Amino acid sequence: MLSNEVASQAVHEAFGGVVPELASRAHQQNIMPVIDRALKVANISPQELNAIAFTNGPGLLGSLLVGTSFAKSMALALDIPLIPVHHMHAHVLAHLIEDAHPKPISFPYLCLTVSGGHTQLIEVLSSKEMKILGETIDDAVGEAFDKAAKILGLPYPGGPHIDRLSAKGDPTFMEFNESNLPDYNFSFSGMKTSFLYALQKEMKANPSFINDHLNDICASYQAALIKVLMKKVKAAQKSTGIKNVAIAGGVSANSGLRAALMQWGAQSEISIYLPPFQYTTDNAAMIGIAGYYQYLEGVNAPLSTSAQAKIKF
């Protein structure tokens, strides 16, 4: 990998979440400077590119349209292949980036993909053959973190703040209701509601309950979410017999989840693959590696290829 440039969108923090209109405008403003910087860091010219890979979905349509339009224009101007990439496939395949692991991951592997928009358990048989074993039926785990953080008065995105405060808290301080789905699917809406009601009850007796016990509240809530994730991934591993287990997506940066997986790996014959932090949140490298494997297959999408807010896995 020659370069992996990212333009942050801190503009959303003031609104407590991503604002689609602001996101697409930021994409328009940043896309040219980011590409120029990427080429400069890589020390190559546009004419040396072999193909253009881009995200065509799923995601916010306005932002996707900016990237799709630019990618099509660039591929046409340079007369090189145009390769559309599924956003979630890219998260899963980020583990194939050359510098992702000291020992390369091998197929098959299970991938727990956890972010603000998705929670999925995926059986990865090859770069182009993947099967969803389970996914959330309502809210993603990243959203569960962010909504709880908002209730606690923490900045957006809330997940990293809960993670940081959890390190200083007691994970047994509070208990929250968790769903008990019989399969590999997830549900976090009930836990979010349980979290809200538990705090409301405590604050009736002690209005300063959150301030007095913030670290313990965060630690308890994070532990409850991780318990659900670990229960499902362990069940899927046992059922499939797959020995390689990976995580992906923004929540894969969570220190508690990473520690729980590493502890499981140390106590079993399971090989755990944790992505480097630069490959956890959305990044260009993961789109590049997913596009690379399609390039090897000779993929060259027509210029009529469109962005899609929702797209089949």
Q: Where in this protein do the model-derived segments appear?
A:
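Conserved phosphate-binding catalytic cores of ATP/NTP-utilizing and phosphoryl-transfer enzymes
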Residues: 85-109, 290
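A contiguous, well-structured pocket-lining segment that forms one wall/lid of small-molecule binding clefts
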Residues: 4, 163-245, 254-268, 295-298
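Glycine-rich phosphate-binding/hydrolytic loop that grips phosphoryl groups
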Residues: 91-94, 275-313
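Conserved phosphate-binding/catalytic loops in two-lobed NTP-binding clefts
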Residues: 84-85, 244-245, 262-287
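Short glycine-rich phosphate-binding loop at a beta-alpha junction
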Residues: 46-56, 240-252, 273-275
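Short Gly/Thr/Asp-enriched flexible loops that form oxyanion-binding sites at enzyme active sites
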Residues: 54-79, 97-98, 255-264
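N-terminal beta-alpha supersecondary unit
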Residues: 1-58, 87, 91
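Glycine-rich phosphate-binding loop plus the immediately following alpha-helix
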Residues: 89, 125-170, 192-193, 197-201
